[in-house]
Amino acid sequence: PIYHTHGLFTATNTVLLSGGSLLFRRKFDVNEVVSLFPLATSLMGVPTFYTRLLNHEGLTRDSVKHMRLFISGSAPLLAETHREFEEKTGHAILERFGMTETSMNTSNPYRGERRAGTVGLPLPGIEVRVTDPASGGLLPQGDIGMIEVRGPNVFAGYWRNPEKTAAEFRPDGFFVTGDLGSFDAQGYLTISGRGKDLVISGDFVEVLWFQGF
């Protein structure tokens, strides 16, 4: 939706600034979307778009031959969905991570490896770290913790709510996103879920694990 940062700033504004055109639809209708592929070059959507497209018999390599790019955001995309879509269409979905308070933070590369199950690498000028949700201490690579970001993309604070602003920022300027995740050895970030969804039971259980059932 265009009232979200992904739909407004990343999708709509960047296309218009580059002189492109947009095909706005009232809602996501999988039959209509498949029929519009010959008129488009890219699709920006959420993970449910791609799971529904995968179940459509009209999604083939031939039907997307005019397409240049498929982008997913706003929620984590299952690695299985990413792999199945690439097998069926030849296109590796470009997944990234952003939020209203920061706009885009990380992205899989346009040119380079788009790693399934990850939201890519920190964008230039943006610092991303993973910390212990309880202590705020920096966690080693591979450990799941709270994702924090710092950079010129981060907002100044919540409107007329200094208490919430103070609660969401670290003293060194990092913004606490509320999302849980981890880095792999190559620096790709994986989102595991929301901090508020965390169950304290001696270990972290990834929300995506449950969503796979």
What are these model-derived regions, one by one?
Residues Y3-S42, Y50, H56:
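Conserved AMP-binding/adenylation subdomain of ANL enzymes
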Residues G137-G142, M146-V205:
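Conserved ATP-binding/catalytic segment of the ANL
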Residues G19, S74, G98, G120, ...:
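Conserved G/P- and acidic residue-centered "switch" motifs that form tight phosphate/ATP-binding loops
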Residues V30-V34, T51, R61, A166, ...:
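Short hydrophobic/charged patches on amphipathic alpha-helices used for structural packing
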